[in-house]
């Protein structure tokens, strides 16, 4: 590897190949503790994994290997915490919402409701990605690079462990035998036992059942939707063109559109249904419903122009009454002749501009003119995640601008990933979550509050959204779907090519930097943006190319089994093919290497130079003609006035370049880029990339820079002879050519091989068909069976249906193969929705092809676990369900950021990480640190920015950027670095789990246990913004976790393993032997069941089992089992074993080993009390973290709420009583006031129009008081302030979105009257603080609705 010049600190040694052998044996320094020998399983649990050696997986003690333990999937939230100042959430981060609900939340929003459908058992899944878990507070340990000095990361792991008292330390040291197994029992109460519930509309009773099985997440299924008050105008159809769940979504959307937000805009609705449920028909139904009510115009925005035909199909399928669909791309800028119908456009069309002047300079202005003033029709933002990053892109701003300029429009957001990441919600301004009259003035405030609240906060938000009637999210069950992972080893020859490429890129970095220094280039942001963009694409192409041969073999095998194949790609590599064509005057003699093209294009177009190289298309660019013209590469578009619309895109030149594996530079440029006028530059020979400056280094500099450039080009061309050719062309060629393969991508032409062996370039266009229709024709050929292989790219396949549809001729089972997996499970599921949709004959098979590069297997595990949780089955060996914890596979959270920070600081600064290095690295520790430091510098990570012209490396190195960059390391180096990062990540999580600070999201309370009962319930009123009166339920839950003898016997009869069965302990304690039932899982690991605690969370090894227990018959086990089961109902383990317990003798409660566990939780308006409860808990336990749990009682009632540790119960109850008294005091004050005089209603309310979507609390929750109202208050008296007084009264219009039983008609009528008639007479004053004048409080009641409402 050629030496890379560092960006700082002088020279460093050139690359040396690692010496052979030299594997080292590492010892875990965490293990040198006197207490480790007895408690190593509970102190340092490990992850069970087939491909990773995680931290501590093989601990050493005195040179002897300790028994390996497995990672427990359950975790405890103990009532005692370590006194530490480093917590994932500080108390202040929760105060900004202490008295403000994010949404209007009904009284029973989070309380229990009967659960009629049965749960589908699934496995550990965090339903919502934990991207929001990243703390927005800039702390020392979260910084990317610590240049010098000791690394101030989170507290020292050893200190953390030793300073945190073990659970055993809370018991008397005179009872050592009592404490055995204590910690494993304590971890029983929480776990990830994810379930999905079969979805059936609960309050909508119209329509027939959906043709396929649909499920809803267990969290959302725990809360009810609002009552239906809207009556559809859609005619009933005997053909059942709309299913019951589609009609339900239409009803709730139209019902929400009747609500006005405090800003005066009409409320919007979010359809979060997954792929295949039928969002298209639902949207079409909303448009038809409004058409029948006289609103004849609608806007429909989507990701691709091709989806216009799908929109027409959806309208036709539901028998729409002749509604025309007009494509905006086919309408001239000055043409507004279309009077009604649906105007269909892409998001990129919103920023289109006309070069010819005329009446309409922009598409946005043309759309506004077409809609007309006072437009109240439907605006559909389909696949609305394409509009993300709205604050930083011109397209996103246009989406927001359109909504603000049409305030009365009925907005519908449709996206399967819409509410999964709060950052993606910035364009959803009509949900009323932030803005005027809400707790959050801006979206940034909302985002900051949610991100700081931890993993479960967004799930609570989604639940409140559902309760409020603004959100619905269902997804197709993956029942019947199968998948498998194909691991493809890298051949030695390919590894050599890969390593050569990595070294050449390191040299290129040095050469680029040297050339920039020589010419005195000051601004380098765009230069390095282009460099790292090309770097990412180059190695992505190499990763894909390694899998092509195996994919062709698998595809041919599946075709021979009478199946058909769908291959998913992210990009096409067409840009390089067109460049070679231009260089060779339209002739080709071989397939083109996309990887080589990326490298050459970077050097030719962006190498630092004082001359402007006038490339094709340079200068002032014209708008692309309506027919799709030649595709411009991403590199050539950067500096020429191009707006890039892609995941992670930004107006900054280098933003978003290191997004994900699923970024598709060429195809995104083709489909999502609009070329506008480039900024005008002086006609200097230097490009816009470089500042106008004099040649400061003399005339010889230009020649020297040119020599550097030509030398680098020669080396790239030499390497290019060994690089793989274009993946897409190679696949089509090896699978039979264009005659056998249906290509649905965005490219215009392809390279094909003729029978005589020659290679030619041909257009994909066909006679009589425009290029826009080629993909549709190819889809028809695949669905009819004319072609049995389809290749789709992400950019062009959005919304395309390729399932084994009952209505098409080709009903062979689909085998969906993917060469690239995105690093987000949500995005992967979205892609798989192309072949798994409603009304299919057979479910598809998925094949993930992965290599051994940079942890690809770990990312495949993320997607596999998500598929399993949705009901899919793997062909391979299923892991034990209790070991599935998806959270450990997600790096995009605060633990990933901290792990990255720690790894970089350790490698660059040699600080102590306390995490063992990867075993067996050639050369040992010294070689590892030397190679990793040099490698990080060679990929631009870890360097610092200076004015002397060194590398401009982003300060905020994200996880995705890190994972992309390390692909540029040699194979053995990137795998070792990824392993080290992964081990550090796991270690940080384990530390926080030990100290009770790990945020595991929403967990299930006592998963797998049916004996859960609600013992008692107390009701408290909570203060809130802008009205009081929301209800919080305090519940005491009892869990009987014991296992009856009959249940144990039934389970034992099903066991077949040689070591399965009942066991008795060798040790006799209190004249009794311990009894258990062991069930072998995989290898030597056993799941253990005990009569008092049921299933034990930790797995036991065969060695530990046989050391303490011996096998017995069923007859021998019965008496000890039944005795232990009966005694443990009221007696702790200490009493059972020793006939006494020190804690009970002291008058305290001991729950050790008891069957019956008591838990305390809060349900109801959680967001209103979150801040105050967190503050109380912080005082008691030094942690403000609130664990959100869900459960299902034995009588099938589901509950979601905050679990209160037993030690905090007393203080929490005191706080609830204070809040309740405060609210009741205000209510009493309001009852004593004279209610306002009823006035005539002047605001019309047509049939079916509902302005009040609120609930009344259950009668038992709060006794029905007489009718009362808050009166208007006089101007404030500075000398007299009422105790507990709140801020000045809010304008009534700001109350319109709250569900506190507000009489909206009266509020709106009062507003209109005040606007028309001016100030009115002030009612009799009352002592207090308020706005006075013309303002008056809204009527609030806890009884049935008012007669006039």
From Swiss-Prot:
Biological processes per GO annotation: bone mineralization; bone trabecula morphogenesis; cellular response to interleukin-11; cellular response to interleukin-6; cellular response to leukemia inhibitory factor; cellular response to lipopolysaccharide; macrophage activation involved in immune response; multinuclear osteoclast differentiation
Keywords: Activator, Differentiation, Osteogenesis, Repressor, Transcription, Transcription regulation
Composition bias, Basic residues: 609-631
Ranges annotated as biased composition (Acidic residues): 177-188
Tissue specificity annotation: Expressed in the spleen and bone marrow, and to a lesser extent in the kidney, liver, brain, skin, heart and muscle. Expressed predominantly in osteoclasts, and to a lesser extent in T-cells, B-cells and osteoblasts. Expressed in macrophages.
Stored PANTHER family: PROTEIN STRAWBERRY NOTCH HOMOLOG 2 (PTHR12706:SF5), STRAWBERRY NOTCH-RELATED (PTHR12706)
The protein's name: Protein strawberry notch homolog 2
